[in-house]
Amino acid sequence: MRGISSKVTRGLPTQSRLQCVDNTGAKVVQLISVLNTGGTARRYPAGGVGDLIVVTVKKGTPETRRQIFHAVIVRQRRPFRRSDGTWVQFEDNACVIVNERGEVRGSDIKGPVSREAAERWPRIAATAKQIV
């Protein structure tokens, strides 16, 4: 995991539902927790693009349902500003399931991946077909 060049707005609070865009068998996941984030007292934890999160699978194959995994957020609907001044917003909230070291569990990522997530997670950048 590396640092990223821009400060991403945290647009996904806990209990949010995300699309899983890899081929691990999970379709819809629910965000349980955001890892490696220093919180503020009484603030509801939230994650943004490039954050490592803990998810549970809500819809998918019977082998993956009701299991807990680590994942990385690759798209979010909430707009965030890049350091060059452009604003980025995607059509959906999406994540990719990874292991604890940041290696992608699946072999394919559907749809675009944000540049911030690709900078921070080189294994996701290698697997992604389109980086925006």
Language-model-detected regions and their locations in the chain:
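Low-complexity, rRNA-contacting terminal tracts
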Residues: 1-19, 26, 34, 86-132
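Short, surface-exposed linear segments at secondary-structure transitions and domain or protein termini
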Residues: 38-43, 80, 116-119
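Mid-chain, well-packed structural core segment of small domains
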Residues: 63-101
